Swiss-Prot record:
GO terms for molecular function: DNA binding. InterPro entries: HTH_17, SinI_DNA-bd, Tn1545/Tn916_Xis. This is Uncharacterized protein YoeD. It comes from the Bacteria.
Length: 76
């Protein structure tokens, strides 16, 4: 399935200008039909999955309790 720049921006939650700049720089593969750029949707699947996995990992690390230090001495 192919998406326009506007649809791709909505799908990836990025701005249209940023998507267009990535297309023009060749960082996103796209087909130009003479009127608009068409971007293959599946090329983002792996990237978005990895991004979600990374977010979950960061959240897991942030939710992990800080262990008490066994070397702490009571100085009373």
């Amino acid at each position: 399935m192919y998406l326009t720049i506007e649809e791709t921006a909505e799908y990836t939650n990025l701005s249209e200008d940023y998507i267009k700049s990535l297309v023009l720089e060749g960082k996103i593969r796209a087909v130009h039909d003479g009127e608009q750029f068409l971007i293959y949707k599946e090329q983002f699947k792996t990237h978005l999955e990895q991004l979600e996995n990374y977010k979950a990992l960061v959240q897991e690390i942030l939710n992990e309790p800080i262990p008490e230090d066994i070397d702490v001495k009571d100085e009373d």
